[in-house]
Amino acid sequence: MRVPEIPEETASPLRAGDPPAQVAGHPLIRRSARVPRWRARLADHDAASLAELLRRAGGTASAARAVSGKVVRHAFGAEPGAPAPAWDARALAALGVGAWAHEALLALDPAPSLEIAERAPAQDDTLRLVLRAGDGALIESVLIPGPARTTLCVSSQVGCARACSFCETGRLGLERQLAAGEIVDQVRIARALAAERGGAPLRNLVFMGMGEPFDNLGEVLKAIRLLTDPRAFRFAPSHVTVSTVGVADKIEPFFRDARAELAVSLNAPDDARRQAIMPVNARFSMAALKEAIARALPPGRRVLFEYVLFDRFNDAPEDADLLAAYVAGLRCRVNVIPCNPGPDPALRPPSAARLDAFVARLSGHGVTTLVRRPRGRDVGGACGQLAGMARLRQPEPA
């Protein structure tokens, strides 16, 4: 049997009741987990929040909406590689923006808030990026070229508090949330790099980088609204995927508000094994997760289940049977991902024979199944390997 393949695509504060789990001797939430409270950058605003800012500056609701649309198109609507648009009173006047709005708009910095700290090209042409924020926080993104389109793996937090045992980011703890503009700026930087490198344009975004997107859902949704705005970045909502470890109580708000697809990281066929590698399962069982998906999944939409395969842990034919039974009744597909080297040496990738047997068994149940092959593994850019903060957080020379 020929196994279908796709390239690897590496899509709000924690609630007070979440346990302060520990990893490697330190609390998972190491500093303030809040979003930075600055809103002085233009990319921190989608059209709606920009209109609200302008309304508070004295404009009528209709005038504020009209101006915000013009500004979004001017600031973010240019093709990749085009010069940065002018941002001064003359440029605003040329757009037809009245003087009443100039002060509020010109207080917003249109430049990206991130800078490239490291570029790590892989042998397969994947590019791992480490980006530095204004406060020194380090964020990783991964640019994954393909024949028809390039994919960017986007981060939503600095670190992560969810502590999945196969994920390097989970060992770092949660340092802080990313602001919407910092999420957007990952895309701005990557889109320019993709144009510079040639090849297929950046058209696909997956929130599968550092962090749990549902733990920063407000900023993630705001960023997605700007990224999918036809006046701005123009990403198709069907080409934006947000991956969650399974924070079940955020699934309904996500489907209500997001212009994006949903991926759920499952990784085990039963609660006992899932909880052994994913602490979130202690709060949201697999049954609760399935119920939340079934209740919220809009008509005509599908959910993507991600299933990282570990040798002799979750890769037996009987495990495929259990997984097929679990996803039965849901409009879905399953991405099977051979695990990459990570923090737990006991979790190893399966042999090719066990991988093929698992996929054949799952497909035999009528489950749409794809295999996601590793990309960027040699530079630490594959699924579960993003830990650039630890690599680069070195004392600065005196």
Curated annotation (Swiss-Prot):
Q: Which InterPro entries match?
A: Aldolase_TIM (IPR013785), Methyltransferase_A (IPR040072), rRNA_lsu_MTrfase_RlmN/Cfr (IPR004383), rSAM (IPR007197)
Per the UniProt entry, the disulfide pairs are: C153-C383
The UniProt note on the cofactor reads as follows: Binds 1 [4Fe-4S] cluster. The cluster is coordinated with 3 cysteines and an exchangeable S-adenosyl-L-methionine.
EC number in record: 2.1.1.-
Family annotation (Pfam families): Radical_SAM
Q: Which residues bind S-adenosyl-L-methionine?
A: G211, E212, S243, S265, L266, N267, N340
Q: Where is this region: Disordered?
A: 1-24
Q: Which residues bind [4Fe-4S] cluster?
A: C160, C164, C167
- GO terms of molecular function: 4 iron, 4 sulfur cluster binding; metal ion binding; RNA methyltransferase activity
An example GO CC term for this entry is:
cytoplasm
Query: Where on the tree of life does the source sit, at the highest rank?
Result: Bacteria
Q: What positions does the domain Radical SAM core occupy?
A: 146-378
In Gene Ontology terms, what is a biological process of this protein? rRNA base methylation
Q: Which residues cross the membrane?
A: none
PROSITE patterns documented for this protein: RADICAL_SAM
Report the family membership.
Answer: Belongs to the radical SAM superfamily. RlmN family.
Name of this chain's protein: Probable RNA methyltransferase sce1580
* Phylogenetic lineage: Bacteria, Pseudomonadati, Myxococcota, Polyangia, Polyangiales
